[in-house]
Amino acid sequence: MLTLCMDTAYKYLSLSLIEDGKIVAAIDEECFKKQSEMVFVKLDELFCMAKRDRLAIDSVCITSGPGSYTGVRIAMTIAKTIAEVAKLKLFTISTLRLYSNGEKNTMVIMDARASRAYVGIYDNGNTVMKDQVMNLNDINPENYNVVGDGSLIGKDDKMYTISGAFLKTMNFWEEVKEIDFLVPEYLKESDSYYR
């Protein structure tokens, strides 16, 4: 099965093709607020790198949020359209779970603005603490491998390769049964995105 994986939820554009437990081709770039401009160009590039036809994919996997208001919607809109038109399977994974890379005892932190962060804690991909929005002062990273925007809480910023993370977290992909009902997991009210 050839799966197109996409993440545009935060400041990265990650596109990869995974087949039989291997990455066939991948593009991982930081391009905050430019994903919508770059995604189709990079999709063409991805399929050229892989020497595969776009019609060869059997499924699509995307991050479902949290993330930037527009960012989460970019990959989701593309994936829903492809899956619906081509009758493909569609899978989702939490952005924070993906960014944990399936590693042990990992706290993922992503800037949510206004002195807050999206935080999720995972152990080998399993949820220890559900994804939530927290005030920066309330986050205690002690005893955790901190991934993401660690500098928000006095740690180093650290990020795994997102395309590789899709592969390492495959067991946690959730199949979408009703594409029409798939909506982003924002975790905060829409008006707070403008702060």
What are these regions (language model features)?
Residues 1-22, 34, 91-195:
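Oxyanion-binding and handling regions
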Residues 59-90, 95:
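DPxDG-like acidic metal-binding loop motif
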Residues 43-59, 140-144:
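Phosphate/pyrophosphate-binding loops at sites that engage ATP/ADP/AMP, CoA/4′-phosphopantetheine
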Residues 32-48:
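N-terminal phosphate-binding loop and adjacent alpha-helix
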